[in-house]
């Protein structure tokens, strides 16, 4: 057993943290916890254990938020990008771009003479056991997102111009190990969410 020294202020913050869990239980609502750390590099040792214990107590399942672009390999998901995507990360900021989403990265479809549409293939190493949410925006122009699973179109979404964050929900019954997303230039993708309450 390891003990930690903490200030009264830290203890008070943790009490508020766990009080929110109790309130959520009473309201039958959920709490999302975001963890930024080195688990993406070293594996999910400590945060995985904490997540497991919290889920035993409070419920919920799934991987959670997964970056659409990362310099490490996210657990269980890999991507293949067409040549007409630009990649953004807060670790290597580019002047004029500041919309990274929760995973702190984004990709943006750009004009490309080799292809009219940008495409992204998503490969799941294991099928998700809950619905998939794909987070996006199209700040400067209208767009259209087409999503297919093994040659069957499952979603066709008209996207209004605007920087507001939006998401598409793909029901778990329609998810196969390979999904393909196609869009026009200007669309920005921020992340996938594979979680359920």
Locations of regions flagged by a protein language model:
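N-terminal secretory targeting modules
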Residues: 1-36, 40-197
């Amino acid at each position: 057993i390891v003990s930690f020294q903490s200030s009264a202020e830290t203890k008070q913050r943790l009490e508020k943290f766990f009080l929110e869990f109790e309130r959520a239980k009473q309201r039958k609502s959920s709490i999302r916890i975001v963890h930024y750390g080195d688990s993406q590099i070293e594996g999910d040792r400590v945060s995985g254990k904490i997540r497991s214990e919290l889920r035993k107590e409070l419920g919920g399942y799934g991987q959670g938020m997964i970056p659409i672009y990362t310099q490490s390999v996210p657990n269980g998901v890999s991507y293949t990008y067409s040549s007409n995507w630009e990649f953004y990360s807060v670790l290597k900021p580019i002047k004029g771009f500041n919309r990274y989403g929760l995973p702190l990265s984004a990709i943006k479809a750009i004009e490309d003479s080799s292809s009219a549409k940008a495409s992204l293939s998503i490969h799941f190493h294991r099928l998700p056991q809950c619905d998939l949410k794909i987070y996006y925006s199209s700040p400067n122009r209208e767009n259209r997102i087409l999503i297919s699973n093994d040659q069957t179109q499952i979603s066709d979404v008209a996207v209004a111009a605007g920087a507001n964050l939006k998401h598409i929900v793909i029901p778990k019954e329609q998810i196969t190990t390979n999904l393909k997303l196609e869009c026009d230039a200007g669309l920005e993708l921020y992340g996938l969410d594979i979680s359920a309450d």
